[in-house]
């Protein structure tokens, strides 16, 4: 079986990707209209958008690496109750 063409991939997945992109745009609009201090999760999303716009291959790996904790030593005590999806010191 051969790999699908770009047109075939677009035919299958474009509308889903379009909806997700519009969802993200609406989310960022809401964040930008909101009061309060900066949030590491929003910084992480904005960094990911830069990765997407650069057009390099392996975008998923690059974004996940950006969002990951680069330290090698475990913390004595966590400063959050749960994972947030983006390293807080990003």
Task: Enumerate the predicted regions with their spans.
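Surface-exposed peri-terminal alpha-helical interaction modules
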Residues: 2-90
């Amino acid at each position: 079986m051969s790999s699908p063409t770009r047109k075939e991939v677009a035919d299958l997945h474009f509308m889903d990707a379009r909806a997700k992109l519009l969802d993200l745009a609406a989310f960022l609009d809401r964040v930008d209209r909101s009061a309060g201090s900066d949030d590491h999760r929003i910084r992480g999303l904005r960094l990911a958008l830069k990765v997407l716009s650069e057009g390099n291959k392996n975008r998923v790996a690059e974004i996940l690496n950006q969002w990951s904790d680069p330290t090698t030593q475990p913390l004595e005590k966590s400063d959050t109750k749960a994972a947030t999806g983006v390293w807080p010191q990003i």
